[in-house]
């Protein structure tokens, strides 16, 4: 027989989840569900800034932590985003990792693996094509007014050998994950950089890649 306390806790959880579902039409549930549920259960995000009550704002922000920007609308703490205009898959955050281990990354991505990730390789020239067009645009439009535009010297205009096609190898994890977990996972496999899409898809970028890998989401269980 269930105790009254357990029944009350279950009812409270159901009520909180129903309230969340009602107020999170534009919410990125794939990314935010776990953390939002935790904060709601702890009753740290119950106030409504839109109605002039921000008594819990600080506690709610601390609870959501690094996911505040992406998830504050899920708990009614900020204005809802219109994801139809800018879908999360079209935006991403990139960062270089300070201590890559190229030999480890190559070893983990050689041949077929039964792990929960997808290995994708493509020509470095393809990786750079979008960036090259952007740099050319910046250099030619209103040139007298843009003398201070800086262009990275280690990729676009550097000599590029066509004797052997260089390949950029990246790894997409199958499941959604937080940006913090994405960074840790890519570090643990020796990647040089990582790209975290705002739908929570994680891409680890190998040492042969010149820029930041692919801009296309290819996480099997985290596509939207």
Curated annotation (Swiss-Prot):
Signal peptide location: 1-26
- So which domain of life are we looking at? Eukaryota
Q: Which UniProt keywords apply?
A: Developmental protein, Glycoprotein, Secreted, Signal
Q: Which Pfam families match?
A: Tsg, Tsg_N
**One GO cellular component term:** extracellular space
State which residues carry a glycan (glycosylated): 53, 82, 148
The similarity annotation says: Belongs to the twisted gastrulation protein family.
Return the domain comment text from this UniProt entry. Answer: The N-terminal domain is sufficient to interact with BMP4.
What the protein does?
Answer: May be involved in dorsoventral axis formation. Seems to antagonize BMP signaling by forming ternary complexes with CHRD and BMPs, thereby preventing BMPs from binding to their receptors. In addition to the anti-BMP function, also has pro-BMP activity, partly mediated by cleavage and degradation of CHRD, which releases BMPs from ternary complexes. May be an important modulator of BMP-regulated cartilage development and chondrocyte differentiation. May play a role in thymocyte development.
Its quaternary organisation is:
Interacts with CHRD and BMP4. This interaction enhances CHRD/BMP4 complex formation. Interacts with BMP7.
Q: What is this protein called?
A: Twisted gastrulation protein homolog 1
Identify the coding gene.
TWSG1
């Amino acid at each position: 027989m269930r105790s009254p306390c357990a029944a009350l806790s279950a009812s409270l959880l159901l009520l909180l989840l129903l309230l969340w579902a009602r107020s999170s039409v534009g919410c990125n549930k794939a990314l935010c569900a776990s953390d939002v549920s935790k904060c709601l259960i702890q009753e740290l995000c119950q106030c409504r800034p839109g109605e002039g009550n921000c008594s819990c704002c600080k506690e709610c922000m601390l609870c959501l932590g690094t996911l505040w920007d992406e998830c504050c609308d899920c708990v009614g703490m900020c204005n809802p985003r219109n994801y139809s205009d800018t879908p999360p898959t079209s935006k991403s955050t990139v960062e270089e990792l300070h201590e890559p281990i190229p030999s480890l990354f190559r070893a983990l991505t050689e041949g077929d693996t039964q792990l929960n990730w997808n290995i994708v390789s493509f020509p470095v020239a393809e990786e750079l094509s979008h960036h090259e067009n952007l740099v050319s645009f910046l250099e030619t439009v209103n040139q007298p007014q843009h003398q201070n535009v800086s262009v990275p010297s280690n990729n676009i205009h550097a000599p590029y050998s066509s004797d052997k096609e260089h390949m950029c190898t990246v790894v997409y994890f199958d499941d959604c994950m937080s940006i913090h977990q994405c960074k840790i996972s890519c570090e643990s496999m020796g990647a040089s950089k990582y790209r975290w899409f705002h739908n929570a898809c994680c891409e680890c970028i190998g040492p042969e890649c010149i820029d930041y890998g692919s801009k296309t989401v290819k996480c099997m269980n985290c596509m939207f």
